[in-house]
Design a protein with these regions (language model features):
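Conserved AMP-binding/adenylate-forming
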Residues: 209, 218, 222-309
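Glycine-rich beta-strand-to-loop/alpha-helix junction loops that act as flexible
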Residues: 213-216, 356
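A polyampholytic, Gly/Pro-enriched intrinsically disordered region
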Residues: 173-182, 229-233, 254-263, 420-426
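AMP-binding/adenylate-forming catalytic core of the ANL superfamily
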Residues: 180, 283-396, 419
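Nucleotide 5′-phosphate-binding alpha/beta core
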Residues: 1-89, 94-109, 113-116, 174, ...
């Protein structure tokens, strides 16, 4: 497709933080004006004194996920409905829908932000999109970004019976997939499925250039393991259904916030204070969103933000995503987080072949199960238990399991029979699948 560039800000159009802040404030007045058109913000804002600077904006209450749920479906809508291009809902587990919607103009911004990959996306690429489509944004977003630059998109989904892991591996191998988009865990499962199919991930997929990943916190240790398994760079992306892409990785491996397209704050929920950098929860104000403007939207993701220099020259703040505060669990007096525990698991020697694991935090003990070949089981159990003790000062029970225990072999190799709905069956056919086709 290779559409001409839009008039939105592009990388390299500013020099340093001051230029960046000036760019943000130049757009902020328009952003607030758009927001004032929605029923939610019309009630929250003082029409006679709309915020015009970042300092003014900081006086407004945070917008929360609950605000979005309470205003389902269109209480946040700031344009006529006929201007909407798509409607989405996030994948949260709160039980209430969290809506998001975008105009065609919003989609230009969305696709451009996602496509800011240092390795590039071009018409020569075959791009496997292996995240959900349906009501979620993620699959549609990657698809749009790929087409924006002319890539051939393979819409793999990852919540479809029509695309089991065996088919993912076949498509990657036979089509010569060059780029993929998925959660990091998928890349590990593909490697296992490829091995089960008789392939060597690092050598039998020569067209593969990079793995784009996002959707879960990713430690350096797991990233390095995935990269070694496949022999290509792992390039991280960070965002949400409510906002689209918020950060991407530069050639030097650092994750940068797209602060030319959004205004970011770091919120300390203990004190209620906000600042431009440091550790806390990420608060975002997208600057170029018409359909559903968000002012000071709290993503509730724990992050660390800094404005230190980076050799890439993008002059954008860097971010480390630490996950959700609610994802930590107590064992004794220690708080165990998946991020810290993952770093320990993937710091085990590659020779142990530990990539699949799970853990349960109990009152006095951390129970961990890992898939590991029998010849490495005792060493892996002992080393991981020692690492947990050193990192958290808690007792742990590490159990090595045979391959196929946590990720069953049939999940890697099965090809489900996906059929259209039928009502009439022959005498020897299974009519249990009538109407409910699966």
């Amino acid at each position: 497709m290779n559409q001409p560039p839009s008039s939105l800000p592009r990388l390299g159009q500013w020099n340093g933080p001051e230029d960046l802040f000036s760019l943000q404030e130049k757009q902020l007045q328009q952003t607030v004006a758009w927001a004032a058109r929605s029923p939610f913000y019309r009630e929250r804002l003082n029409a006679a004194a709309l915020p015009t600077t970042a300092a003014d904006l900081a006086s407004l209450p945070l917008t929360t996920k609950q605000d979005l749920r309470d205003n389902y479906p269109f209480g946040m809508l700031a344009v006529p409905k006929e201007r909407l291009a798509t409607y989405h809902e996030s994948s949260g587990t709160a039980g209430q829908p969290t809506p998001s919607y975008y105009t065609a103009e919003d989609w230009v911004d969305l696709a451009e932000r996602f496509a800011r990959k240092w390795i590039g996306i071009s018409a020569e690429d075959i791009f496997l999109v292996r995240t959900p489509y349906a009501l979620l944004l993620t699959g549609h977003l990657a698809h749009a970004a790929g087409r924006l630059h002319g890539a051939t998109v393979v819409p793999g989904d990852n919540r479809s019976l029509a695309m089991p892991y065996a088919r993912v591996v076949r498509v990657m191998h036979d089509l010569g997939v060059t780029l993929s988009w998925s959660v990091p865990t998928e890349c590990l499962i593909w490697a296992a499925a490829a091995t089960a199919a008789g392939h060597r991930p690092a050598t039998d997929f020569p067209a593969l250039r990079a793995l784009f990943v996002g959707g879960e916190p990713l430690t350096d240790a797991r990233r390095r393991r995935i990269s070694r398994l496949w022999g290509v760079p792992v390039i991280e992306e960070y965002g949400s259904t409510e906002t689209g892409s918020l950060a991407g990785e530069c050639p030097h491996g650092r994750l940068h916030l797209w602060a030319d397209r959004a205004l970011f704050e770091v919120y300390d929920p203990r004190t209620g204070t906000v600042r431009a950098e440091g550790e806390g929860q990420l608060v975002v104000t997208p600057l170029y969103r018409e359909a559903m403007p968000l002012l000071r939207y709290n993503l509730e993701d724990n992050v660390s933000v800094s404005y230190d220099d980076c050799a890439c020259g993008w002059n954008l703040p860097t971010i480390q995503v630490l996950g959700r505060a609610s994802f930590g669990h107590r064992v004794g007096s220690a708080t165990i987080t998946q991020h810290r525990l993952e770093e320990l698991v993937f710091s085990l020697p590659d020779a142990y072949q530990v990539v699949f694991w799970r853990a349960r935090a109990e009152p006095t003990t951390l129970r961990i199960e890992i898939e590991v070949p029998e010849e490495h089981r005792a060493a892996a159990e002992a080393e991981l238990a020692a690492s947990v003790q050193a990192a958290f000062d808690v007792d742990s029970e590490v159990t090595g399991l045979p391959a196929g225990t946590l990720i069953p072999h049939h999940a890697l190799t099965a090809m489900p029979d996906v059929v259209k709905p039928r009502s009439l069956f022959g005498p020897d056919e299974d009519w249990g699948k009538a109407l409910l086709y699966y």
